[in-house]
C-alpha cells in the first residue's frame, strides 16, 4: 500500500516541547539586560499614560526566600501588565539598609572575633559594608526571578543623598510642630536595649503570673466612707510593676460592692470573683465609683500611697474593676497620670533590671538591685503576704520584640515622638490632627482586598504617638541640637539645612565624626559651646516611610509620579510600611503617597503552618528555580489566591508544572500549524467557517473575562478563565475539529488558511495575557515564529500590545452558528454511544462512524467536523427523542491519506485527497 505521510501538512516548529527553563532563562535574561529591556519599558513610544509602582524596600540582610519571590514576582506581573497595556513604566527597586538586624550581625561577628569597636564611625562602616554585600546578593537573586526594574540605579536608604532626604523629611515634621521630646512609657526591648515602635512589636503567647492583690484603704478614706475596713482588690499580670504603683483606676459611674470581709470590687464582677475564691460572697455595702475618687489606699509592697482615680480604659468584663496604675510602665496609666498629676516612677534600666531608683525612692529593698524584672516576680509575689488573695498562671497574647522574639516591657524614658493628636496647619490653611488627616486620606485610597481599608483605619484610630528615637548606632541620626540655655531643640532653618547639606555631601557619619562647632553653620559657631547633639537614631520605619519623597519627589518625576499608582506588600505592612508612608505623606503633603494598596498573604507549608528551619518545612527558592525554572515559580504565584496565605510544597509546584506544560504545548501546536503560512495572507480577509466563528466568539468572551480579572489584579481568576478556554473550547473542541483541514487540505485551501488566521489570533491573545507572567516563555515563542511576529508587528516580547482580533481578521462581528449548542449536546451524546461501540469492538474510532440526525436544521458539515465522523445524513424515518441520532459504521472505505471512510474503492484516496494530490 502506498505511503501518504509525506503528502500531509505535518508542520513542525523549532519551539521545543520541553522548556529546559533553568538553562534557557538566564540566557534570555542576559539578552534583555544587553538590550536594556527596562529602558524600553520606560520609553514606550505608543505611550498611553504613566504607571508608577513604588517598591517597599526589603531589608539588606540575608538571602532571599520564597516570601521575597512572591512579593517581587507579583510586583513584576503588575508592572508588566501595565506596560503591555501601553503605559510608560516607573519602577525603582530599593533596599532598607539601616537598623538593628545588621547591628546585631556585626556585634555577633565582633564577639566571635573577641574584639570590641567603640568608635561609632568604624562600627557604622562595618554595617554599611554588610548591607552592601547582601544588597548585591539579593539583587542578583531577584534577577533570577525574571523581574525587571531600574536595577542599575536602585534606591538605598544608606546613600548619602537618601539619608539627607530622610533627614529633610524629619525637619518638615519638626517645623510643623509634630515632633516633641517627651518622658513617657514606650515599648522597650531589653534584649536590644532600645525603644521600639508599635510596628516593631509582634504578639505571641506567653505564660505570666496572674495575681489578685488587696490594697487597704487609708484611715481617712475609711472614715469618709464610714466603714471600719475596706481594701480595693486589683488584678495584674505584671507583678514586677507593683513597685511603681501610684494609683488605682475605677470605672466612672459604676457600682462597687463591699463584702463582709472588707473587699471592694466592681459589683458586675463580684459573683465571678466569689466563685474564684478571691472575695467572699456576702455584700454589705454598695458605692458609686464617683464617691470613691480621690480616696487613698496603701500599696502593700512598699506602703506608699495609691490614689483612687476614674479611668475610661477600665472595663467590667475581666479582672476586678480596679486597675493597678503605674504611669512609668503603661501608656493608659501615663495619660491617666497626666489628668491626675501622678508621679511617674520608673526604676528599670536598659537591660530590664531594677536600678538604684528603687533604693532612692524606697520602692523595693536593696536585694532587688540589678535583678531582671521577670526573674524578680516570684519574690515580689511572696512579699505581698496576706495581701495576695489569689495567684494563678495564665497564657495570654503578649508583646514581643520582632527581631529578638523576646518579651518587651513598657518603660518610661525620654524619647522623641511624632504626635498623632496635635493640630497642625494644612495646605488650605485649616488645622487638623495627623490622625484626622490620615483617616481622611485612607478614604481616598483603593485597597485590594477591600478589607485592608478598615484594617488600616482601625490601626490609625487606635495607634499611640509614634516613638521615633532609637538608642542604637546604625541609622540616620535624629540630628538636632539642644540649646543648653533653654533646654529646647534648635529648629532654625539655617542650622537644619546646613546639616542636611553636610549629610548629602559626606553622609550622616559626620554626626558622630564632627564636633558641634563643625556641624553648625558659620553664623552659629561662636555659640557652639551652648549646644549639644541629640545622639539617638531614627526608627527605620521613618527611613522606609519617607522613600516616596526620596525616590519620587526629589527626582521630580524622573523615577515616577507621587502619589504612586500602586504599592504592593505583605499584609503585615498595614502596621509597618503602609502606616509609616501614610503618616509621613500626610504630614508633608496632607495626602497618602499612594493611590492603591495591594496586599498578599504569607508563605506557609502544605499544612498551613509557618515555615521555619527548626520545623524542617522550608522550601528552598534556589532549589525551586533550579528544578522548575522561574516561569513555573511565576505561574505558581499567579495561579494562587495571593490575598490569602499561600500553601507550598513540591506537590503544588508539580501541579503548576502541569499547567505550564498545557500552555506551552498549546502554543507549540499553534506555532507548528501556522508555520507554513504565506505572510501575504495576513493582510487579506478570509471566509471563516461557523466553527471559526464559534472559537473566535469564545476567545472574545475569554479575553473580556481575563482582562476584567487582571484589571482587578485577580490573576488566579484570569488564569482559570484562560485555562478553561484552552482546555475546553480550544483543545476540547476546535483544535480536534480542525486537524483534518490543517493536515489534509491543500496548503492554499481557503478553509485551512482561515483556520490558520484563527490560530494566529488565539496565539496572539495567549501571548498577550501570559507575557506578564511567563515572560521568558513568550519571548521564546516569538523567537521561534516569524509568522506570529509579523502578525503582531513585534520583534520580541517587549513589542507586544493588545490587539483587536476583529480588526486583524477584518471581521465586524463573530457569528456563532445557530443551533450550535444543540450540536454540542449531540456531540456529548454521540461520545457516550461511541464509547459503547468501542467496548463492543464494533468500531475503533469516530472516523469509522456515520451518523443520521433527525433535524435538517443542524449543519451537516459542522456535525461532521465536531464529531469527526465520516458521514452525516438526515434520517428518513422518525427518530426517538433519546438519542436523537442513529450511529452506524460508515458505508465507504478508509482513505489511506486522511483516514476518513470516504473512499469509494479500497486503498484509494477519497475525492478530497485526490484533488490535493493533483495540486502537489
Swiss-Prot record:
It is an enzyme of class 6 (ligase). This is Isoleucine--tRNA ligase. Its EC number is 6.1.1.5. Keywords: Aminoacyl-tRNA synthetase, ATP-binding, Cytoplasm, Ligase, Metal-binding, Nucleotide-binding, Protein biosynthesis, Zinc. IleRS has two distinct active sites: one for aminoacylation and one for editing. The misactivated valine is translocated from the active site to the editing site, which sterically excludes the correctly activated isoleucine. The single editing site contains two valyl binding pockets, one specific for each substrate (Val-AMP or Val-tRNA(Ile)). One of its GO terms (cellular component) is cytosol. GO terms for biological process: isoleucyl-tRNA aminoacylation. L-isoleucyl-5'-AMP binds at residue 569. It is found in: Cytoplasm. ATP binds at residue 613. A motif ('KMSKS' region) lies at residues 610-614. GO terms for molecular function: aminoacyl-tRNA deacylase activity; ATP binding; isoleucine-tRNA ligase activity; tRNA binding; zinc ion binding.
